[in-house]
Amino acid sequence: MEKVAFLFCVHDHQPVGNFLHVLENAYEKAYLPFIEVLKKYPLMKISIHYTGTLWDFFKDHHPEFLETLRELVKKGQLEMMTGGYYEPILAVIPDTDKVGQIKRLTQTIEEEMGVTPQGMWLAERVWEPHLPKYLREAGVEYITIDDYHFKKSGLREEDLHGYYLTEEDGKVIKVFPGSETLRYLIPFHPPEETLEYLSRLRGSSCAAIFADDGEKFGIWPSTYHSVYEEGWLERFFELIGKNLDWIEPMPLGIYANREKPLGRIYLACSSYMEMDEWSLPTEAMVEYGKVVERLKESSEGGQIRRFIKGGFWRNFFAKYPESNDLHKRVLHLREKIGDKKKRTVPKSQDPLLYLHQAQCNDAYWHGVFGGLYLPHLRHALYENLIKAEALFDRKMHREKEWIDLERLDFNGDGDEEVILKNPEMVLLFSSRGGSLLEMDDRSKAFNILGTLTRRKEGYHHNLLESRVQSSRDEASTAKTKTIHEIFDSKEEGLDQYLYFDGYRRASFLDHFIAEPMDFESFRRCQYQEEGDFLKEPYEIEVRKKGKYQEVFFTRSGSLCKDEKRDQIKIEKSFSIPTHQRVVKTSYQITYKGEKGKTNFGIELNINLLAGDAPDRYYNIPGRYLEDRKLASIGALNDITEVHLVDEWNKLKVILKTDKSCNLWRFPIETVSLSESGFERIFQGSSLLLYWPLELETGGQFEVTVELGIQSL
């Protein structure tokens, strides 16, 4: 009798920059217990993928775990899979890096396990048709993605119990369709339900393919209790063992070598079903969700659903400009570095070592995991980008004092940017708002301006409609939830923090605010802006002045008061020295309208990552702050200097002005989804320096603001 081939594939990953205690928890709750249970059941032969961050972690902290893996590989119980070393979205990194990252992980597996992997895990299953050419160049013979990809190309469920061939430029690879049904059954439903699914294939030579995250076996909410303490995994393996007369567990590679393909297929650009929803614009995402729910209630819903597709992964770059800027900064530097074959440098001095880490996918997108919303993950990517850029520039500039300037549309948004560098820092200016988007302290590898804008997400309506279940009620839920079903909240009243910004939270943003000014309205971005300078383009001019580089921004705009529009002009110049971490900004405002009043404000957004940590705080010389945390809220008058101190990273951000100002300070906090539900996250400290202006025709106002970084 023909047996059902049960192909069980697990993918384990932790992002670059994740905290060590998070990795240790994942190891204790998922990676180690899974392998310990697997060892007890030699009948279970599976495929497994660990990303490079985990290989590094195991080598540094748990070499004994690697020894266990070697034993299972030698016994044929584990098939190791390769992939991009730092889990990049392969489709959006340079082709040489596609191959380079895969080969690096393959080499690591060869060195540690003594085998050469045939198969590859595709990060986030983000498929694009050009990939086979580069996968084959890297030595990959097969990959596994989702059956969703195949269904979008017209295939049915019954067509997906094996693998298909696809190619690009004649380079052929084998592609397995992982079952969506099994992905939702395992390990959230009783093992018997999975066996029932497999039994439908009984008597055939079909394959049932499970391929999903290993973190769902212990890390996802409540799964450690269900999978190990209640014994789901052992019961599942025992159940398979009792039915070996008609089920044959085997690694994907064994099946690929033994069985013929089901046919040829060409797959459209896609990821898994949920990712295609998350990548949609917010309003479209909400509508898409409603359509999918309606289809579930329709008798023909399943048939129609095959032909409905969501978004496209690359649109995260359109959805989140912060993600796009980081991605394009990495690409821009990669182009400068060029082909590794032309360079001979020690590994520790190779900028590609760091640039590859900056390609790690997690902080470039957001779904129900924290992703982009987690500041420490964004910081880790910038940290590696800054290190790579510093190594590259060190080789380009032998002198101690130098300054470089580039004018270009580096991020493809249709507007001009200026990248300005000296040995101590990197600055990124945007013509939009004449703003500063990035300020890198090279000595600390730290972008101090990495603040995320507060945006409406498709899932926020769950909070607004009060359909959030308290995490305290989780224990009363009989069935373990998948990560996609969780709408719990880490604290009550999070809907009160749902404020959305009308502009990007950059720095040196120019505000005109009418009297009476209201702090709360401004903090919530629910105030009335009189000027039109926040999002409109400024004209750019650059000049070299001795050892200083100057960047001039000019915009003639208008001030809307009492339905009248009066002309007003802002000229601001940024002066940067050749060997310091400071930028001096001089403003000149010229008013051409009728006599009146307004308040001119300069907004800066600074992110030192920890809003409530005692070692990160405000210090205002000569003033006592009852609450000096970076997440504190307050208003002060007659201020000329503000310090934001980071004792952990041993740096201090200093803000000075030559005219005493009023100061508002408040945290930028987002409400986003994570693995365990809704959470509030500190994204940065917002500071508004403002001055009341008596407007007169032809009148001018001048002020100088200096932003600098010092080491502690």
Residue map of PLM features:
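Polysaccharide-binding surfaces and accessory modules of carbohydrate-active proteins
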Residues: 581, 590-663
